[in-house]
Amino acid sequence: MITIDKILEILKNDHNFREILFHEHYYYNWTQNVTFNALSYDSRQISSDTLFFAKGATFKKEYLDSAITAGLSFYVSEIDYGADIPVILVNDIKKAMSLISMSFYNNPQNKLKLLAFTGTKGKTTAAYFAYHMLKVNHRPAMLSTMNTTLDGKSFFKSHLTTPESLDLFRMMATAVENQMTHLVMEVSSQAYLTKRVYGLTFDVGVFLNISPDHIGPIEHPTFEDYFFHKRLLMENSNAVVVNSQMDHFNIVKEQVEYIPHDFYGDYSENVITESQAFSFHVKGKLENTYDIKLIGKFNQENAIAAGLACLRLGVSIEDIKNGIAQTTVPGRMEVLTQTNGAKIFVDYAHNGDSLKKLLAVVEEHQKGDIILVLGAPGNKGQSRRKDFGDVINQHPNLQVILTADDPNFEDPLVISQEIASHINRPVTIIIDREEAIANASTLTNCKLDAIIIAGKGADAYQIIKGNHDNYSGDLEVAKKYLKR
């Protein structure tokens, strides 16, 4: 519940209030008592006591008209649509929605310890490590790209890396109702660009890495803009953890100089001194030997990042150790074995940098033929297509099958051809993803060989023309073709 007086107070304090406009009259205050028992940005979810946010570049007046027909009596907007109900006019609808949602749900962020991860890659894995560390002796909730849990028992698929602010604070409130003590979440650059976490301060923020990604017409116009929005997490955290090996580390180091911080990686005190496939040793604040199920040194580095963050939250080394040993992540380096001994690796690697690291890990363990099944999503991250080609060109013996990966409103054949245009040798294009995996499964001969299925991980859908069409998932499809 929230009153009109409280809403106006919030907006005025944030210098985000213009006026209330009703029947061509302007109001700085509203003398009538009005209470809202629901918030919505979806015109299909409206009741008479709902406060509606008219937001988005594609918003149309007919959406508002539909909401008014359903009983809407007040809305918030940057634009006066000339409707027959009062409008609270603001300078920034996204800021308004975040702060009003925060208050509506009784400031749940103050009742949880908040841990956030940002980075081009590794956010989900690091979040899972932290979740398992905290779970040993606490009650963490988690919002991740892969899965969300608000009670530690039931999990559901997330549609955005970081939810819309209204949904975010509703989820936090549910976690509080479920007596959760901590919230682990991923914070994307888009979350700051679209102000989904506006006004939110995290107890610990972690910056894992940075490389060009999410650059395109509907995302970030330049790498500089992408990097800037990533760094905003540092300015909105009470303590930070940063990878000293990341590109452009110096500016981040300067930015966090006066914030309590820990660095990890080769240029810090917190460093891996010994790395095996399923164990590693760390010196520094986390000094110990750790068992780990996820192969690859980059996963060990993600574990260190999560461990340092949890240490800041009061988690013991023993709980950190147990958490790392227990962590698995759906769609991250999941391994199957064909009857001929060849390995199939299913991984979410979905940009050039993560593909590069995935190939390095697989090639370290598999010395025979390696077949890569790969695609790129439509209508976002166009720069990935060239990045994939550049990485593939560094592996001349890699056999490549290009396929569909969430083509959305683009033609998957055109996407595949664009990737192929950046590759300096012939590749195979099989648009049907299951058919591509089936074809790859016929190309192995012995235990030294491997198939890498990259991009979708555990996603049990294909995004086609705006819809989430059913798809068994790469792991389930691969299981059909183990006999060789």
Curated annotation (Swiss-Prot):
<protein>
    <recommendedName>
        <fullName>UDP-N-acetylmuramoyl-L-alanyl-D-glutamate--L-lysine ligase</fullName>
        <ecNumber>6.3.2.7</ecNumber>
    </recommendedName>
</protein>
<feature type="binding site">
    <location>
        <position position="43"/>
    </location>
    <ligand>
        <name>UDP-N-acetyl-alpha-D-muramoyl-L-alanyl-D-glutamate</name>
    </ligand>
</feature>
<feature type="binding site">
    <location>
        <position position="188"/>
    </location>
    <ligand>
        <name>UDP-N-acetyl-alpha-D-muramoyl-L-alanyl-D-glutamate</name>
    </ligand>
</feature>
<feature type="short sequence motif" description="L-lysine recognition motif">
    <location>
        <begin position="405"/>
        <end position="408"/>
    </location>
</feature>
<keyword id="KW-0573">Peptidoglycan synthesis</keyword>
<dbReference type="GO" id="GO:0047482">
    <property type="term" value="F:UDP-N-acetylmuramoyl-L-alanyl-D-glutamate-L-lysine ligase activity"/>
</dbReference>
<dbReference type="InterPro" id="IPR004101">
    <property type="entry name" value="Mur_ligase_C"/>
</dbReference>
<dbReference type="InterPro" id="IPR036615">
    <property type="entry name" value="Mur_ligase_C_dom_sf"/>
</dbReference>
<keyword id="KW-0067">ATP-binding</keyword>
<dbReference type="GO" id="GO:0009252">
    <property type="term" value="P:peptidoglycan biosynthetic process"/>
</dbReference>
<dbReference type="InterPro" id="IPR005761">
    <property type="entry name" value="UDP-N-AcMur-Glu-dNH2Pim_ligase"/>
</dbReference>
<dbReference type="GO" id="GO:0008360">
    <property type="term" value="P:regulation of cell shape"/>
</dbReference>
<dbReference type="GO" id="GO:0071555">
    <property type="term" value="P:cell wall organization"/>
</dbReference>
<dbReference type="InterPro" id="IPR013221">
    <property type="entry name" value="Mur_ligase_cen"/>
</dbReference>
<dbReference type="GO" id="GO:0000287">
    <property type="term" value="F:magnesium ion binding"/>
</dbReference>
<keyword id="KW-0133">Cell shape</keyword>
<keyword id="KW-0131">Cell cycle</keyword>
<dbReference type="Pfam" id="PF08245">
    <property type="entry name" value="Mur_ligase_M"/>
</dbReference>
<dbReference type="GO" id="GO:0005737">
    <property type="term" value="C:cytoplasm"/>
</dbReference>
<feature type="binding site">
    <location>
        <begin position="119"/>
        <end position="125"/>
    </location>
    <ligand>
        <name>ATP</name>
    </ligand>
</feature>
<comment type="pathway">
    <text>Cell wall biogenesis; peptidoglycan biosynthesis.</text>
</comment>
<keyword id="KW-0436">Ligase</keyword>
<dbReference type="GO" id="GO:0051301">
    <property type="term" value="P:cell division"/>
</dbReference>
<comment type="similarity">
    <text>Belongs to the MurCDEF family. MurE subfamily.</text>
</comment>
<keyword id="KW-0961">Cell wall biogenesis/degradation</keyword>
<dbReference type="GO" id="GO:0005524">
    <property type="term" value="F:ATP binding"/>
</dbReference>
<feature type="binding site">
    <location>
        <begin position="161"/>
        <end position="162"/>
    </location>
    <ligand>
        <name>UDP-N-acetyl-alpha-D-muramoyl-L-alanyl-D-glutamate</name>
    </ligand>
</feature>
<feature type="binding site">
    <location>
        <position position="196"/>
    </location>
    <ligand>
        <name>UDP-N-acetyl-alpha-D-muramoyl-L-alanyl-D-glutamate</name>
    </ligand>
</feature>
<dbReference type="Pfam" id="PF02875">
    <property type="entry name" value="Mur_ligase_C"/>
</dbReference>
<keyword id="KW-0963">Cytoplasm</keyword>
<keyword id="KW-0132">Cell division</keyword>
<feature type="modified residue" description="N6-carboxylysine">
    <location>
        <position position="230"/>
    </location>
</feature>
<comment type="function">
    <text>Catalyzes the addition of L-lysine to the nucleotide precursor UDP-N-acetylmuramoyl-L-alanyl-D-glutamate (UMAG) in the biosynthesis of bacterial cell-wall peptidoglycan.</text>
</comment>
<keyword id="KW-0547">Nucleotide-binding</keyword>
<dbReference type="InterPro" id="IPR035911">
    <property type="entry name" value="MurE/MurF_N"/>
</dbReference>
<dbReference type="InterPro" id="IPR036565">
    <property type="entry name" value="Mur-like_cat_sf"/>
</dbReference>
